[in-house]
Amino acid sequence: NGVLLAEYAKALKEAGLDSVNVSLDTLDETEFQRLTGRDELNAVLAGINAAKEAQIPVKINTVHYQHLDWKSILDYTNRVQIPVRFIEMMPIGYGAAYTGGSNEELFRQIEECYGNVSEAGTVRSREGKKYSADIRDLSYTEEKQQSGKHGAGPAAYYRFPGLNMDVGFISAMHHKFCRSCNRIRLTSEGYLKLCLCYEKGIDLRAVLRDPGRKQTLQEVMKEAIFEKPAEHCFEQVSEMTEHNAMVRIGG
C-alpha cells in the first residue's frame, strides 16, 4: 500500500489523519513486483516522503518472510528516521503458503549487526520507571511501547545502539499476545472483525440500516467486543474459520 499516498498526503493531513502505516517488504524493485504484482516501489517511497513532508507520523510494516532483506529495510528506515515493525508471517490467505521466520531469531541477527539492546541505555515507561529490554521475550508489554509514543498496539519496541529509530516486533506466531490484544478491525464493507483468525464478527452496516434497532451503535460494538475470542489458533490452521486473503479482508 501507499501507492497513492504522495498524491493525497497533504489532503489527508488537512482532513485530520494523525498517522499512517505503510507496508514495505523489500527495497528491491524486482522483488517488490514479484510480491505485489505491481512495479510501484518508487511510488510507495514517494508516498512515504510526502507523508513525512505533510508531518503525518509514519510507521513501516515489514512482514518477516523467508528471504527478507531486513538489513536494507533497517538502513532505509534509519536514514529516513521512521520506526519499523517486523511482523511474523501469519497463515492468512496466501500467507499459509509461505515460510515465515521467527522474530526472536531476527532480533538476534539485528543485535549482531547493530549492537545489543542492553547497551542502548534505558528508556522510560509511562510511569517514569526505567527498564531494560528482555531479549528473550518479544511479547507486548506496556513498557515496551517506549512511553506510548507509537500508540497502544501489539508491537514490542526496542532501540539498538547502531540505529537512531525504534524497531518493533509483532510476533503473533512465536510470542502470542492475545491476552493483551486490544485490536478490532472495521472493513470497508462495514463488518467489524474481532480477530483475524476467525470469520466471526458483526455487520455494522446492517445495524445502522435497521430502523427498529433499540441499541446504539456504541452498545452493539461493546457487546461484540466482549465476544472477542480468547486467542487465535494460527498454530492449528484446521480450526481457523477466516479463509480470505488480507487484501480481501482489508480494514
Question: What is each stretch, according to the model?
Answer:
Residues 79, 89-92, 96-251:
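Auxiliary Fe-S-binding modules of radical SAM enzymes
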Residues 1-87:
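Radical SAM/AdoMet-radical enzyme domain recognition
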